[in-house]
Swiss-Prot record:
Protein name, entry field: Probable serine/threonine-protein kinase HSL1
Family matches, as Gene3D superfamilies: Transferase(Phosphotransferase) domain 1
GO cellular component, one term: cellular bud neck septin ring
Composition bias type Polar residues, residue spans: 55-68, 492-501, 759-774, 1222-1243, 1265-1278
Protein kinase domain: residues covered: 81-369
EC category: transferase
Region: Disordered, residue numbers: 1-43, 55-83, 467-502, 599-651, 741-783, 856-898, 1005-1030, 1150-1170, 1220-1243, 1259-1291
């Protein structure tokens, strides 16, 4: 974070990212065919990078600015909770110990900052207020605000937290961490969670080593029971690992924590998001396939069991690629010291095929578990488990409706539906539209929606505020249940009165308070006879933000005691007494009104009834209507909701104390980074995974999804997973798209289902209960007639809503709620208890990128291992060739994300040829209102176009790279789309991927696995929990490409992966790069689809080797390229097997010793990695975060299925690292030779084996040497000569910015290039003595280096190179005399000035400064600002110019961008300023600012200006 691309002086201090950075992204993204999507993507990426980097480097800065600025008093209390010490800090928040001032109960409060800027957004009335109130949790208040807010504020992604809240409300189990309540104020969310002082199981395991089997099974059994309980709700945790398991040492009880990645698995719908920690993720997740959550959780449990019993992990490697491949293969070493039962259970859990994997029920019946059932502790637990089983809570088949039967609510109209609960259901149902869920709730048949609605309603009722003595609770509940008609009337009255009182007393607006307010109001109006008239306690609105109304309620203890017996599905932790705080701008305006009316007696379930029915749940659901208790519950008891009983329950201090005493968990790890702060919070904060669009399944997944489409009810399953929803909600109109898809598909099926169109409730009832997705093998084929019918039914309402507001119910309340928000402005933000409130889903317009990668055709070829024959060490250049159809792989560098320029002339200039216009935009952009089905008929066409786009998507394929390349440019070594396209240096040894599919390959797609056999060994830092031991010979899975099967000297078949997988080291390596581990290499990446891989997909030897190598390194002409199209590597290209002795088998045996000291496969030191906590990766920007291999668990989200891993980082990101010194200490790049290994080419410049390849080589830059990135880029530009960049110190230089264009221009624009080459050669020959750049070379390879010397004259290189110098004849400059002169010139120019003392320099600067002031030239052109900007950047790239973005400003129609530039040779600097003028012309000002000047630099400057003039003139002609 030390340096930004733009100077800090240009950026306000408090900004999370510099203005220049954001502006650059916006400006460059404009050129993209879909600027809105591109800029959004870039901003998400950069924001996630910023957040993650801050988390790593400045953990203290994660506290929100708003919190810091708020008064100390505001942070001392939250409702009844007195805040204590900070237990831990995370990227997006912190966890503090808290004590209930009323009950003395301890809790851990997770404080998640909300960003400002969404308080007053809804006042314009453009969206219903209830909708805009979702600002509280979605950080986006309206479509117009979304982009602005996102660009200005780091995304804490409260939406993910909101999902976590909803899930935790549904789950109450002794082995699951409890959520007591949720509070909020203007700037923060407060999740009041169980406090456990025992710490994480991870810490315990680290301190104790492997556990005795008896103890391990004791804990494991609890884990399985908790997981099984979650599965009974169709909820899958998806991130089970010791770090997320809290241990109450006193009670020896496990608590499952961190539901940030949990998801509801919908019937007939597979989960698609690859998430979790790589070490614990199941193979199906690692392969990026759709999967059932249940079996995946079981796999994770198996890994945890293995770790408990052995002290290390079965699959472990510092190199993420290797780790994932190990998991994918499912091969591990079973320790011989385990008992036979343990080995048997582990072998049944760790099965690759999820359908054959044991289930949680079977685990609990396994002999290993039964073996220790007689333990005294286990007897108690067994009794508890028995109770849970009686409630159907421990079944693992996820047939929710068969297992849980709480009292089911009967709803008769939309008006009865509680908006906050509806919002929660939307979250759980992955963004399904409100109309569809509403339709399901109103249907007679039983449905999962109704069940969850009932459960959430019960939770809400129990956590509502009681405003009267609870002694009357039960009594009043009974009375009210008898008077259903009166209660309905009363609820109406209450609603009206509540609305009136709401206007009169804004302070008490909150969904929780409104229940009580309504109740009291109803009583005051005497409109009800049936409702207990004893609720007369006044509603106290307190003005202080966090003060508490401590209304004593001595009589509530009885009711509370009864409440404790309620089913676990409803946490009984009460909220504080009368939390009547002013509703900060946030929430509830209209929603609370709605809940006011809805949550009134009508919708609440009486506690007693629900308790009965839940305990009864052995009774099948279809009998539900016949059960008197249930029947009364659903009809009358539900209406009796005003019953203060439920309200009082939440108040009972006794109840709180009792429950909490039993469950203290979480946050014991104050000493070791609290589990919360780093896991739950940071995951949520960076939930970019959720922000990314999830596309249709890959071809391999297609069959499953087709089945899904056939059978799945659209209302329940939108085509996108929940994470898509997050992305779309926050950044676009994906919600609209989702609904369109649902409705379109529904419409297509309507005709097919016409005969079934008569919705039969009995059938429906069975359907949903039977359709549970959890059945591991049960795919989408579980559909039921009912669901279809329901969906027809639910679908129709939305069909006719094209003209309606998305939330018509609240439209009329807009004015009221906006005024309410305005009233709130001047006052201090109050803390609101939002335990039961949720904000409306943000329905922003956005883009949905559709990608279906079809690459299976190449598998055949790729399966053929390439012959092994030692060849000279070759360096291959990374080349990305643009493909007409290729969807651009989104990169962090804005310039990477630019599709073809609008101006065809500009395009030709950039790419050296005019290629055909792409048939369609790279992006699929569909707009539509979420609730308008006008475009329903377009579904089919849209899908078709999506297919074409998908096929046009150009997956980044890794082609063979020389085995020496330790780093293989982390970014450029993108393996074809899903497979391992993530640089391992970012993936800490135990991180949690939010989306592993990004880096995982499809099973059928082996080609992407064809990681160059040559890829050099990576220098992986450390193997957590592992140490290298005997290798196991494993046959690679079918999806492992045969290309990888290059055998090393070990001869172990499993080791074939190590060459490639070593290519990227652990993140720690980024921090301490050994100089002897660098190898210069390159690979040629084809950014092409499998069908389009014909363009130069084969790796070429770089020109640094002997002449014959140079010859082969020459880029193949376009005509020849198709020959190599079938595979991603040249068939005749043989890969050197150097360093076989050092290669390791990626499937190395696990250490059997307790120490678990893992030996890194790299040369870096080993460390006992047990202490490194798993990092949950939830960010798509993982590739840009240097996660230290420390105990910090960083949560990064990687969930952008639609975009390839960025191959370059932006200038801004590079500059953050402050990698290069201002002036190179030595212009010659000779240090690198010492860092190359073995018998490498003299010219093999060391490329960092770590993540540095992605940015720049830290060592290179810090030592004043050119970064390998620049070397790589220049070598791409000049295939036959070593780029002059090697000797230059690039300033935050971005690598390979426009390799495609350069390559194309080399190939296609041959004539023009030749002609310019000739001129350039002449020019260079004239100036050779002064301008030829120094080249990295060894004496023995002088000839080769000479060839590499087709360098461009120092400055002249700059622009000349753009078109001409790109591939100037190497022979022209291959003479040794030139080399000599180059060195001399070096001494003359830059070094000369450097060696003078300060006094001489001072005067020299004075004299040269005068020259510099005069050396300025303006170029006026009629091309657009963006085109001029792009041309300039391209010129920089092609002319070996290092540049630094100084300023970029787009204000009031005026666009200005400034760059500080420097030629790769010498100290010759200049400025370029591009300004748009009101008359639509653009002025490019080139100003020389070098402190010293000479003839050659002046000449070069003139030449550069001529080049600029020529380029813009050519562009302007069009």
């Amino acid at each position: 974070m030390t340096g930004h691309v733009s100077k800090t002086s240009h950026v306000p201090k408090g900004r999370p990212s510099s203005l220049a950075k954001k502006a650059a992204k916006r400006a460059m993204a404009k050129v993209n065919s879909n600027p809105k999507r591109a800029s959004g993507h870039l901003e998400r990426v950069v924001q996630s990078v910023n957040d993650a980097t801050k988390r790593l480097s400045q953990p203290d800065s994660t506290v929100s600015v708003a919190t810091k600025s708020s008064k100390r008093k505001s942070r001392d209390t939250v409702g009844p909770w007195k805040l204590g010490k900070t237990l831990g800090k995370g990227s997006s928040g912190r966890v503090r110990l808290a004590k209930n001032m009323e009950t003395g109960q301890l809790a851990a409060i997770k404080i998640v900052p909300k960003k400002k800027a969404f308080v007053h957004c809804s006042n314009n009335g453009t969206v219903p207020n209830s909708y805009s109130s979702s600002m509280v949790t979605s950080n986006v208040s309206s479509p117009s605000i979304a982009s602005r807010e996102h660009s200005n504020h780091s995304q804490t992604n409260p939406y993910g937290i909101e999902r976590e809240i909803v899930i935790m409300k549904l789950i109450s189990h002794t082995n699951v961490m409890a959520l007591f309540e949720v509070w909020e104020n203007k700037s923060e969310l407060y999740l009041v969670l169980e406090y456990v002082d025992g710490g994480e199981l991870f810490d315990y395991l680290v301190s104790k080593g492997k556990l005795p089997e008896r103890e391990a099974i004791h804990y494991f059994k609890q884990i399985v029971e908790g997981v099984s309980y979650c599965h009974s709700f169709n909820i899958c945790h998806r991130d089970l690992k010791p770090e997320n398991l809290l241990l109450d040492k006193k009670n020896r009880r496990i608590k499952i924590a961190d539901f940030g990645m949990a998801a509801l698995e919908l019937p007939n719908k597979l989960l698609k998001t690859s998430c979790g920690s790589p070490h614990y993720a199941s193979p199906e997740i690692v392969m990026g396939r759709p999967y059932h959550g249940g079996p995946s959780d079981v796999w994770s449990c198996g890994i945890v069991l293995f770790a408990l019993l052995t002290g290390h992990l079965p699959f472990n490697d510092d190199n993420i690629k290797k780790l994932l491949l190990k998991v994918q293969s499912g091969k591990y070493q079973m320790p011989s010291n385990l008992s036979s039962e343990a080995r048997d259970l582990i072998s049944k859990i760790l099965v690759i095929d999820p359908e054959k994997r044991i289930t949680t029920q079977e685990i609990l019946k396994h002999p290993l578990i039964k073996k220790y059932d007689d333990l005294p502790v286990n007897k108690v637990l067994r009794k508890m488990r028995k109770d849970n089983m009686a409630r159907g809570k421990s079944n693992s088949d996820l047939h929710l409706l068969n297992n849980v039967s709480p009292s089911i609510v009967t709803l008769h109209s939309k008006g009865e539906i509680d908006e906050s609960i509806l919002r929660s259901l939307q979250i759980l149902w992955h963004g399904v539209s409100r109309e569809l869920i509403t339709a399901k709730l109103l249907q007679k048949p039983m449905s999962e929606e109704k069940l969850f609605y009932s459960l959430l309603l019960q939770y809400k009722q129990r956590h509502s505020i009681s405003l009267s003595s609870s002694s009357e609770n039960k009594k009043s509940a009974t009375e009210s249940s008898v008077n259903e008609p009166r209660i309905e009337y009363a609820s109406k009255t209450a609603n009206n009165t509540g609305l009136r009182s709401e206007n009169n007393d804004v302070k008490t607006l909150h969904s929780l308070e409104i229940h009580s307010e309504d109740t009291s109001t109803v009583n005051q109006n005497n409109a009800i006879t049936g409702v207990n008239t004893e609720i007369n306690a006044p509603v106290l609105a307190q003005k202080s933000q966090f003060s508490i109304n401590t209304l004593s309620q001595p009589e509530s203890d009885k009711a509370e005691a009864e409440a404790v017996t309620l089913p676990p599905a409803i946490p009984i932790f009460n909220a504080s007494s009368s939390r009547i705080f002013r509703n900060s701008y946030t929430s509830i305006s209209s929603r609370s009104r709605r809940s006011l009316r809805l949550s009134n007696s009508r919708l609440s379930l009486s506690a007693s009834t629900s308790r009965e029915t839940v305990h009864d749940n052995e009774m099948p659901l279809p009998q539900l209507p016949k059960s008197p208790s249930r029947y009364s519950l659903s009809r009358r008891a539900i209406h009796a909701s005003p019953s203060t009983k439920s309200i009082h329950k939440s108040l009972s201090r006794k109840n709180i104390a009792a429950t909490v005493a039993a469950r203290r968990t979480l946050q014991n790890s104050a000493s070791k980074r609290s589990l919360y702060s780093l896991q739950s919070i940071s995951k949520r904060s960076l939930n970019l995974n959720d922000l990314l669009v999830f596309d249709d399944p890959l071809p391999s997944k297609k069959p499953a999804s087709e089945n899904v489409n056939k059978s799945e009810p659209h209302s329940l399953e939108s085509d996108s997973d929940f994470e898509i929803l997050c992305d779309q909600i926050l950044f676009g109109n994906a919600l609209d798209r989702i609904l369109e898809e649902e409705e379109d598909n529904e419409k297509e099926r309507d005709t097919q289902r016409q005969r079934q169109n008569d919705t039969k409730s009995s059938a429906d009832t069975f359907t949903i209960s039977g359709v549970s997705t959890n059945k591991e093998n049960e795919g989408p084929e579980y559909p039921t007639k009912i669901e279809k019918n329901q969906f027809n039914m639910s679908y129709k309402p939305s069909e006719n809503m094209s003209g309606l507001s998305s939330f018509p119910i609240f439209e009329k309340e807009n004015t009221l709620s906006s005024s309410y928000l305005e009233e709130q402005k001047p006052k201090r933000a109050a803390l609101s208890d939002i335990t039961n409130s949720f904000n409306k889903m943000n329905k922003q317009e956005g883009m949905r990128i559709e990608k279906k990668i079809q690459r299976e055709q190449l598998q055949k070829k790729n399966d053929r291992p390439s012959p092994l024959k030692p060849i000279q060490h070759q360096e291959l250049r990374v080349n990305s060739l643009p493909n007409d159809q290729g969807k651009p792989s989104l990169s962090l560098d804005p310039r990477r994300n630019i599709s073809q320029p609008v101006n065809s002339k500009v395009e030709s200039l950039l790419q050296g040829l005019k290629f055909k216009k792409e048939p369609a935009s790279h992006w699929t952009h569909e707009r539509g209102s979420l609730f308008m089905s006008e475009h329903v008929e377009d579904e089919k066409p849209v899908k078709a176009s999506d297919v074409s786009i998908e096929s046009s998507y150009v997956p980044l394929t890794t082609v063979a790279t020389s085995s020496r390349d330790p780093s293989v440019l982390a970014e450029s070594s993108t393996i074809q789309k899903p497979m391992l396209s993530l640089p391992s240096s970012f993936l800490n040894t135990s991180m949690t991927f939010k989306n592993l599919s990004q880096i995982l390959a499809d099973d059928g797609d082996d080609k992407h696995l064809s990681v160059p056999q040559n890829q050099s060994r990576s220098v992986a830092m450390s193997h957590p929990l592992r140490k290298q031991s005997a290798k196991i010979s494993l046959t690679p899975r079918s999806n492992l490409n045969a290309n990888l099967s290059v055998k090393r000297n070990q001869g172990s078949p499993g080791s074939y992966l190590s060459n490639d997988l070593d290519g990227i080291s652990d993140m720690t390596f980024a921090m301490e790069i050994p100089t002897n581990t660098f190898t210069a290499q390159a690979i040629q990446l084809m950014n092409n689809d499998t069908d389009n891989n014909k363009i130069n997909t084969s790796p070429k030897a770089s020109s640094f080797t002997k002449e014959k190598v140079i010859k082969s390194a020459a880029y193949i002409s376009k005509e020849k390229e198709p020959d190599n199209s079938d595979t991603n590597y040249i068939p005749d290209y043989t890969i050197p097997n150097t360093y076989d002795e050092k290669a390791i088998n990626i499937f190395e045996d696990a250490p059997s010793d307790e120490g678990s000291l893992n030996t890194s496969s790299s040369e870096s030191d080993s460390r006992a990695s047990v202490h490194r906590k798993a990092v949950s990766i939830d960010t798509m920007a993982t590739t840009n975060v240097l996660t230290p291999a420390t105990n910090v668990r960083v949560s990064l989200y990687w969930n952008n299925n639609s975009s390839g891993i960025p191959r370059e980082t932006t200038e801004e990101i590079l500059s953050k690292l402050r990698l290069s010194p201002e002036n190179p200490s030595n212009t010659h790049m000779q240090k690198r030779f010492s860092s190359t290994r073995g018998s490498r080419d003299s010219n093999a410049l060391g490329i960092s084996q770590s993540l540095q390849s992605m940015f720049k080589d830290l060592e290179e830059d810090q030592d004043g040497h050119t970064s390998q990135a620049d070397i790589l880029e220049s070598s791409m530009s000049y295939s036959k000569r070593r780029p002059s960049e090697e000797s230059v110190n690039p300033k935050q230089r971005v690598t390979m910015l426009f390799d495609e264009e350069e390559e194309e221009s080399k190939k296609v624009g041959g004539g023009k290039i030749k002609e310019e080459h000739t001129k350039l050669d002449n020019k260079i020959s004239e100036e050779s003595s002064q301008l030829v750049l120094p080249v990295v070379e060894k004496k023995e390879n002088a000839n080769n280096t000479e060839n590499n010397y087709s360098k461009i004259p120092k400055p002249s290189t700059i622009k000349v190179t753009k078109d001409t110098a790109m591939e100037s004849n190497t022979q022209t400059h291959t003479k040794k005399p030139i080399l000599k002169s180059v060195q001399n010139v070096e001494v003359e120019e830059a070094p000369s000035s450097d060696k003078k003392n300060w006094f001489v320099k001072l005067f020299q600067n004075f004299s040269s400064h005068n020259n510099a002031t005069k050396a300025s030239k303006n170029h006026v052109t009629n091309i657009s600002f963006d085109d001029a900007h792009m041309l300039t950047l391209n010129e920089f790239n092609k002319n070996s110019i290092d540049y630094q973005l100084k300023n970029l400003d787009h204000k009031f129609g005026r666009k200005v961008v400034e760059y500080d530039c420097k030629f790769v040779k010498g100290n010759f600097k200049f400025k370029i300023k591009i300004t748009s003028t009101p008359n639509a012309s653009t002025v490019i000002t080139v100003k020389k600012r070098s402190k010293h000047s000479n003839t050659s630099s002046n000449k070069a400057f003139e030449k550069f200006n001529d080049d600029v003039e020529r380029v813009i003139r050519n562009a302007g002609r069009s």
